[in-house]
Regions:
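Glycine-rich phosphate-binding loops of nucleotide-dependent enzymes
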Residues: 1-238
Length: 238
């Protein structure tokens, strides 16, 4: 579904992404982990089009999107939910989701967009809050709204950037179940996360980054015992 080949991005003297190669298969939940500053968010920004790479190629559904703007990637089926939720606070949950359903699709009939919102609001459990102003939501409800708004763009691949940050353990478990339902609805998921219990519970496959490079990938239990991964998180033993 998604193929990344030799992707590099430099900020001054810092190589934030260093010849990254990565594949995401349709139907999987892929986690990208690594210590702070490993290049995870840079990678997500390159995939979603918020940054342009200095080198390398990105293909999505068999087509090159390396130079495509973010909105073109959204129209093609790349959705993204952000760690910092920024809804329209004076608008209701329903209205926020309708914005997502209509984004970049001016010719979409309103009734079609409303059907999309209805499906997503049921999937994400936000129906009881449909007419609530977004500014009145709890943190967990805000996170659900962010996921739901991304889903309203009808993505084939959903990028999640630490969407569980700040949640209590019980809330994180609810969010894990929601992401599973999203995958079961036919959406492939690539997510960045620091909470290892969440990664272990969700990921079919884990990619580990450090200093802009992929240093390991595979099932969680395999990468968790990889010496390079332990060194990245804990430092080299003296």
């Amino acid at each position: 579904m998604l193929s990344i080949q030799g992707l590099s991005k430099r900020f001054g003297g810092v190589l934030a992404a260093n010849s990254v190669n990565l594949r995401v298969e349709a139907g999987e939940i892929l986690a990208v982990i690594g210590p702070n500053g490993a290049g995870k968010s840079t990678l997500l920004n390159l995939i979603s089009g918020l940054l342009r790479p200095d080198e390398g190629r990105i293909e999505f559904l068999g087509e090159a999107i390396t130079q495509a703007p973010p909105e073109a990637r959204t129209w093609k089926g790349l959705g993204r939910a952000f760690q910092i939720v920024q809804p329209f606070p004076e608008m209701t949950v329903w209205e926020n989701l309708l914005v997502g359903a209509l984004y970049g699709k001016p010719n979409t009939p309103l009734k079609v967009a409303e059907r999309v919102v209805e499906e997503v609001i049921q999937l994400t459990g936000l129906a009881p809050k449909a007419q609530t102003s977004a500014g009145e939501l709890t943190l967990l409800e805000d996170k659900r709204l962010e996921l739901a708004r991304a889903l309203c763009t009808r993505p084939k691949l959903l990028l999640l950037d630490e969407v569980m940050a700040g949640l209590r353990p019980s809330e994180a478990l609810e969010a894990v179940e929601l992401v599973r339902r999203i995958r079961d609805s036919g959406v492939t998921v690539l997510f960045i996360e620091h909470l290892m219990p969440v990664v272990r519970a969700l990921a079919d496959r884990v990619v580990v980054m450090d200093y802009g490079q992929v240093i390991a990938e595979g099932p969680y239990d395999l990468v968790a015992t990889n010496p390079k991964v332990r060194e990245a998180y804990l430092g080299r033993a003296s």
